């Protein structure tokens, strides 16, 4: 208690404001930029051919109204991929390539895509805003 008294009111106010800002509900979200080497149109085709819409709702993909996985709308504005990976292009490519290795409890199957296809998928998902 003596320590708090020595800090004084201005220091306590600054500390409280800093903690309040750090504990906010959402981190600032920004739309991710283009994925190096990724083509959004090819990504849409890969998503269609891989039947991602069986599990996910995906704007712009015919019949993609799945309810098993999360909807992939506004993907670039999300802070995390699969609830725990920071949402970066490289992390998304890794997730698309190896979901079971990253999270053994995930329901997402291995799609057996190559890195170029995963980059294309990431490019498509990041332009969904």
Describe every region a protein language model picked out.
Residues 1-12:
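Bacterial N-terminal signal peptides that target proteins for export
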Residues 19-22:
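C-terminal motif of bacterial Sec signal peptides marking the signal peptidase cleavage site
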């Amino acid at each position: 208690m003596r320590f708090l008294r020595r800090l004084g009111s201005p220091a306590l106010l600054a500390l409280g404001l800093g903690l309040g800002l750090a504990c906010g509900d959402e981190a600032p979200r920004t739309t991710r930029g283009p994925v190096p080497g990724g083509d959004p149109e090819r990504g849409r085709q890969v998503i269609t051919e891989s039947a991602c819409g069986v599990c996910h709702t995906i704007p712009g993909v015919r019949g993609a109204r799945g309810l098993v996985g999360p909807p992939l709308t506004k993907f670039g504005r999300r802070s995390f991929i699969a609830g725990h990976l920071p949402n970066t292009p490289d992390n998304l490519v890794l997730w698309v390539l190896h979901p079971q290795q990253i999270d053994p409890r995930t329901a997402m199957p291995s799609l057996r895509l190559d890195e170029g296809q995963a980059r294309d998928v990431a490019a498509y998902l990041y332009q969904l805003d």
